[in-house]
Amino acid sequence: MVVPIDWKYKSAIVECDWLKENIDNPLVRIYDCSTYLHYTDDHPSKPYDVVSGLTEYKKEHIPQSAYLDLQNDLSDKDSPYSFTLPKLSHLAHCLKQRGIGDPHHIILYSRNGLQWATRIWWMIFVLGYKKVSILNGGFAEWKRLGMPTEQALTCFPAADFKSDEKPEIFVGREHVLSSIDDGQSVLINALTADIHWGQNKRYGRPGHITSSLNIPFHSLVDPDSGKLVSPESALKIFEDQNISSNLKITNYCGGGIAATLNAFILYQLGFENIFIYDNSLSEWAMDPNLPMETC
């Protein structure tokens, strides 16, 4: 018999019905976090073109929602990788200028998978602001339920919050290297199985970081609704891979996006030692000195 459990931080996930009821609350601020990856073979060192979701946002969006542009406004412009976390002081300034801060409850949604919302959720989390939720099912679920949309653009006035930074959550290659042979650590690849096992060479060198396990991020999402699977189902997915709370768990993917969904679920299940490899395979697979395997 499966023992019912619940998400540890239930306020970090809101449903569409809740948002519809609270959409006119002046303390609620809603943000579309959508970004698109157009996969291409035109430049092997970068397997996709990044396309802002601003155009789609302007066509229609959840009423009273603003747009957050992950790559153009919230990523390190000096990095060779698409979504590198910027300096936290710069990130905090950018987010505050876009209206994130006290006393507001921030709602994040995306329209092509929850991972874009969870990426920005973690970016705000590492700054110490906790009044942030993702919309379960995102824009697709909102539309499926027949909820209203609009084209009017929203721009919130600046807000403020006291930063309590947790820079250790987003890690680099040295952390990953030290985790490979560490019996108290585990690496989780959030990409699809064909990439993990080397059939798909999207990121250059085929395969996965040596010793890492594969828990594709989409396995944590219901394929019909686009909503998160139940806490019981999510916990079983991790337990089936012998992931326990005493381990240091580092999540990676292609560019630090899908991994944030796995990390978000782990956090919601009460795991504490959670890390995200920021540049992931976009960095790792391009360096032949870093170990990878296909079995």
Language model features by range: what are they?
Residues 1-295:
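Cytosolic catalytic domains that perform sulfur/thiol-centered chemistry
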